[in-house]
């Protein structure tokens, strides 16, 4: 099939590469978000998908208003048979959805109808889910609600960060998307409606959302930190110093004997503990402002923390 591929961040690359290399499909153009400011100088940079397409000589479309009549006409002139979507980053309206005869097929990183929205991988980890996956479905104007073509499942490991899990889902999801498009092309696949039960929503995670709430139970704190690692990254204030945190550990065997209030800090020779709403957790790595991630105990020794210091 003649395909337009819509995607923006790095997790979309596995799908783009697989479709480019498929003998069954022809990626005639890539649709991605406009170049965005990046780095210390804030210079506009192309998205990972845009860079990949340019390197392979595939035309790149970067409309600031993808639902405008002008872009609908531009896409119509390309005459795609189907549009494949992986983390494009914008809602698509009815006129645009009507352009390709086989519609728009989205790869979403959850087992729909669970975790519709922008951050399904993060939501699954934060909620303590043990199984997740990826779903291919036909896009409709409402958010992630269209009929389903196929699914693939993935076990969430106890130490998975969002980055770890997303890397695996990007690969298994790429295979699912390719298989789905093959089935659509030869008319073997018919989508089925999503179940009415089990709907949950995973809104976009902001930097403010990534601030650690030490009043929550330790297991919840641990999951929430993994859910925002590596991006946007968990953070807390220690005194008036804002620091980023790597994953923390529920190390019951070596927990300090004295209780710690939520946010209370206990420094030992080789470890740093912070109190939560239940038992304390052991810090792994910490990133002070302007520095790289480092061992929390090494940082604490150099920082000479006040004995009354608290994380908030």
Curated annotation (Swiss-Prot):
Keywords: Protein biosynthesis, Transferase
Catalyzed reactions per annotation: L-methionyl-tRNA(fMet) + (6R)-10-formyltetrahydrofolate = N-formyl-L-methionyl-tRNA(fMet) + (6S)-5,6,7,8-tetrahydrofolate + H(+)
The EC number(s) this enzyme carries: 2.1.2.9
Chain segments carrying region Disordered: 34-54
Residues annotated as binding (6S)-5,6,7,8-tetrahydrofolate: 110-113
GO molecular function list: methionyl-tRNA formyltransferase activity
Record InterPro entries: Fmt, Formyl_trans_C, Formyl_transf_N, Formyl_transf_N_sf, Formyl_transferase-like_C_sf, Met-tRNA-FMT_C, Met-tRNA-FMT_N
Superkingdom assignment: Bacteria
GO process terms (BP): conversion of methionyl-tRNA to N-formyl-methionyl-tRNA
Cellular component aspect of the GO annotation: cytosol
Similarity-based family: Belongs to the Fmt family.
Function recorded in the entry: Attaches a formyl group to the free amino group of methionyl-tRNA(fMet). The formyl group appears to play a dual role in the initiator identity of N-formylmethionyl-tRNA by promoting its recognition by IF2 and preventing the misappropriation of this tRNA by the elongation apparatus.
Protein's UniProt name: Methionyl-tRNA formyltransferase
Primary gene name: fmt
